[in-house]
Every structure is written in C-alpha cells, then in structure tokens.
Amino acid sequence: MQIIRNNSQDPISISNWRWACFLDETIKAFSTFQTRPYQIDNDFLFRESFFGSSSNPKKVILETWGLKMEKIRQARCACLQAGEITSVMNLVISPLNNYDLPFFGADFVTLPNGHLIALDLQPALKDDINHTQHVWNKLKPIHAHWQSKIPTGGDIPSDARQYFSPAFLWSRIPLGEEGDNLITQTIKPAFDEYLNCFFDLLRDAKITSKERSFQLLNGQKKYMRYRAEKDPARGMLRSFFGEVWTESYINNILFDLK
C-alpha cells in the first residue's frame, strides 16, 4: 500500500530506516526558522519498487524530504531503504547565492559490504579565501577530532577535490556491532557538530553584493553539474526505478540548480 505524502515536509514513513535520527536532527535544527515545503512532484515524494527473484521479492522505498527558507534555496534529503541491508541518506543544504555560505552535505550509505560515510561543508568557490577561510577555521578542529576516531575512506578522485573542503570527513566502516557503535558514538556526534557549525554560519551570514552573488551562483552551478554528472547512486537507482525516472530525479530534484 502506497503511503501518501502531500508535500516535501511531511514525515518520512520508511520503517527501520537506519539514518532516521540524522534527518530528525536536521529537521530539529530547522524548526526555529520559518520554513516552507520545497516543490517536489508527487512521483518523487514517494517511490516504491521491488527487486530480487519473483519467488522472494524485496521491497525498495525512496522518499524525498525538502524545504526552503530565507537564505536557503533548497534543503533536501533522499531517503532509501532496499531490503534489510541497503540504506541511504543523501542530504544537501543549498544556500541562496546572495549569501557567502558553503553547501552542507552528508552522504551515508549502508551496503552489504559496509557503511560509506561522507560529511562536509562543501565550498562553491574553493580557491576564494573570502568564501572558505572563516568556514575552515571553524570546521578544521571539529574534523580533526572526529576523523581521528574512524578509518579513512581512501583517496579522493582528483576531479572531485575542488568540491570538498580540507575538513571532509570520509570513512568506510564495517557492518555489525563495530560499525553500529561507530555510527552511534562517532558519526552521529560528528554530524551534529558539522550541522551546528553550518547553522552558526547561516545565522551570521549577511547579504552580498550583486557581483559577489553572481560569482557564487557560477560556483554553485558548477558544483551541481558535477554532482549530477558523477552521482554514484545513478546505477543503483536505475536498477530499482528505471533510467527515465532516475535521470529526472537526479537532474530535476537532487541537483536542480541550472
């Protein structure tokens, strides 16, 4: 039976979704602001499919949460559960381009071979110290504290480095009790601190000049194009929901700034 969600701020209904407490924390952080639902078509608010054998089909559910408000063009979270193991949270908070703010990005993925953890305040203009220095000064100590407690995720592809800060928290952790403990004791408090850092920057942000806004917009569009072109979830989404739906979802919902 399909769940009816009337708008993007309606609660996510996926039962036993691993990453629910992270989205709950995000919603709580926004609760002190005046927010509105972000316009998302019904076909992307809730999507259900099945995979596996005909004798033992497994359900996959994807729901999309989103909002907008002053200073924030779009905050959105793709929430997916496929079978008992595969679980995804892809959260991006995109500022309006007339504020000198980074993106907030959290990509948490559980697969049969482990958890992938990616957390950052991502720059629109990495080589511009007026855009980055005040962010990195706040974020680097937070990153140093938490990254020391988890294994590294490995090398970042060279073409992707311009879209990550030096405080990119990146890890691969195992399934089972060890991974569960790391998520509870390290990943969740790290996420909370990164989120608090972003909201501190958000509250302090002042409107920029038209010239600066144009520079930021170009940087944001470049970031969005890269994310859309290189989205690692594309293959998985296509296998669950088909090519046409997937390409529309990636380009018109997840990374929609043109």
Swiss-Prot record:
Reactions catalysed: (3Z)-phycoerythrobilin + oxidized 2[4Fe-4S]-[ferredoxin] = 15,16-dihydrobiliverdin + reduced 2[4Fe-4S]-[ferredoxin] + 2 H(+)
GO biological process: phytochromobilin biosynthetic process
Enzyme Commission designation: 1.3.7.3
Superkingdom: Bacteria
Gene3D superfamilies membership: 3.40.1500.20
Keyword Plastid: no
Matches recorded under InterPro entries: Ferredoxin-dep_bilin_Rdtase, Phycoerythrobilin_Fdx_Rdtase
GO molecular function terms noted in the UniProt entry: cobalt ion binding; phycoerythrobilin:ferredoxin oxidoreductase activity
Keyword list, A-Z: Oxidoreductase
Function as written in the Swiss-Prot or TrEMBL entry: Catalyzes the two-electron reduction of the C2 and C3(1) diene system of 15,16-dihydrobiliverdin.
Classification via HAMAP family: PebB
NCBIfam families to which the protein is assigned, alphabetical: PRK13249.1
Family membership noted in the UniProt record: Belongs to the HY2 family.
Name of the protein in its database record: Phycoerythrobilin:ferredoxin oxidoreductase
Gene expressing this chain: pebB
